[in-house]
Amino acid sequence: MKIPANGFTHAGKFHADDVFATALLQILRPDIKITRGFVVPDDFDGIVYDIGFGMFDHHQEPRETRPNGIPYAAFGLLWRVLGPGLVGERQARLIDENFIQPLDLNDNTGEQNSLCDAIGFFNPVWDSKEDQDACFFKAVAVAKQILENQIESANAVNRADEKVQQLSLIHI
């Protein structure tokens, strides 16, 4: 999937799913321009996620769920399409199972998750003068570093697997 130049997600209080979804899009297209709003403009040309009832919005019925019953949130929906291209099918599945599913579960059910809580603390408090979008992008910067580390780790495992496979062929 080619990442367009523009992205749109919901405004207001943000959560780990839209923050990590944005981080993923920035990793794949560093120059992407993300807009936050409450209504997707009719003439918007780009990728829309966590709003708008499209392919990457989980706020619609029936909710898409994984075979294990965990419902997708925006990050999981994007990762399902984009993750394998970054780390391969096997590592994408493992990252989904171990990292993304707990975030998606929190977003859909309120299940306790410390990382989701930490991302949530970037939201400005009720009497703050901070710009909500600026707070969102601070959270995205942290999420992006975490996700880049996840991707690098997964690709290191892929390189190690290849090396072991090469060595095993030599010794046959």
Which role fits each region the language model picked out?
Residues 170-172:
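Conserved small/polar residues in nucleotide/adenosyl-binding loops
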Residues 62, 95-98, 153, 162-167:
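Short, glycine-biased loop/turn motifs at secondary-structure junctions and
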Residues 133-161:
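Internal active-site segments that recognize and position negatively charged phosphoryl groups
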